[in-house]
Amino acid sequence: RLESWAASPTDGDRLDCRATITVGGHDHALSARATGQLGALSAMLYDLGAGVEIHRLHQRHDGADVITILLCGNDDRQWWAVGTGADGDEANRNALIAGANLVPH
C-alpha cells in the first residue's frame, strides 16, 4: 500500500521522489531520483523485491477522474492492473501499486 508520496523537481528533467510503502504490516520509507514518477516508483518497488515491468500503459478519462490500465509483467508472467486518480500521475502510481500487489511470490 502506498501510504504517502512526494515529488519535487531536481537537476535536469529529474524528480526526487519519496514514498512510504506498507508491505506485510511494515512501513518502508523510500526515495528515488528518476525522470518521472513511474520510474521512481518502479525503482522503489524493485528495492522492496516487488519489481514490476510495464509492458503497456493505457489511460482514459472518466469525468473528473483518470483511469490507468497497465499490462504488467515479472519474468515470464503478465497481468493487468488498474488504478484511478485525480490526475494521470496519481492514476499511474495507483495502477503500479495494484500491479505490485499481484506479483507472484
Predicted regions and their residues:
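Terminal or standalone catalytic/regulatory effector modules within metabolic enzymes
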Residues: 1-82
